[in-house]
A protein has these predicted regions:
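Catalytic beta/alpha-barrel core
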Residues: 4-10, 28-42, 59-99, 103-119, ...
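Positively charged, amphipathic and often flexible ligand-engagement surfaces
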Residues: 129, 142-143, 147-156, 188
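Conserved, mostly hydrophobic/aromatic
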Residues: 22, 32, 79, 130, ...
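A short alpha/beta connector and helix-capping loop motif
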Residues: 37-56, 60-76, 175-195
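Catalytic cores of alpha/beta
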Residues: 15-22, 71-83, 112-125, 169-188, ...
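Alpha-helix N-cap and loop-to-helix initiation/capping positions
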Residues: 10, 14, 40-47, 140-151, ...
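Glycine-rich phosphate-binding active-site loops on the catalytic face of alpha/beta enzymes
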Residues: 95-97, 131-140, 181-207
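Alpha-helix-loop-beta-strand connector modules within alpha/beta enzyme cores
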Residues: 42-65, 104, 108-111, 148-170, ...
Length: 210
């Protein structure tokens, strides 16, 4: 199971600091982009990320973007520009009204959204990747919602064969709940359990055993 640190930051300095602390252990990151409209919280912007010179000097790093924004078109255009400077892997879209499947653009299923709704709206296997949110998105530190884990089983039973991410409140208390399930995610996106850790090396070793 792959581990990707999830970075929810407000400033370029905070982003650089977190990447610097974690890049000895991880080379793939997910950055949350929130516009203060789709969710109340507001994060670093794509324009600010594009101006971080230090990211352009680290070619081994790759980045996912988790888009909690109303204007998906503008965000995708911004990521297109960023992709000329850094390696962009997957993009996750929460605003399903604006989603059109692309090779590197998948969806994020927020807790209120059912798998049945996704099946009605989309051809499942046209979606290259799906991220299941195990918290209400927008801020780190929110409570884990165990019922969201059943969506993994529902997707697999519906014939979905592409990768499934899980994001939200993943830590030493919730990982056992995830691992006891027959159907598990392919990738765990882990936020404050890593970014706020006093001993990142110890936590990275624990996660490496999953």
């Amino acid at each position: 199971m792959k581990i990707i640190p999830a970075l929810l930051v407000k400033t370029p300095e905070e982003l650089e600091s977190q990447i610097e602390k974690l890049s000895s252990y991880f080379q793939h990151f997910q950055i949350d982009i929130a516009d203060g409209k789709f969710v109340p919280e507001k994060t670093i912007t794509l324009e600010e990320i594009a101006n971080i010179a230090s990211l352009r000097t680290q070619p081994l790093l790759s980045f996912d973007f988790d888009l909690l924004v109303s204007d998906i078109t503008a965000a995708l255009n911004g990521i297109d520009k960023i992709s000329q400077q850094i390696k962009v892997d997957m993009i996750f879209i929460h605003n399903l009204d604006s989603f059109n499947p692309k090779p590197n653009a998948g969806i994020a299923i927020d807790p209120p959204i059912s798998v049945d709704t996704i099946k009605q709206e989309f051809d499942l296997n046209s979606i290259p990747v799906i991220q299941i949110m195990s918290v209400i998105p927008g801020a780190q530190g929110r409570a884990f919602i165990p019922e969201t884990l059943y969506k993994i089983e529902q997707l697999r039973n519906a014939g979905y064969r592409n990768k499934i991410y899980l994001d939200g409140a993943i830590n030493n208390q919730t990982i056992p709940l995830i691992m006891e399930k027959q159907f598990r995610p392919d990738i765990l996106c882990i936020g404050s359990y890593l970014t706020q850790a006093k001993n990142i090396e110890e936590r990275a070793k624990i996660l490496g055993k999953i």
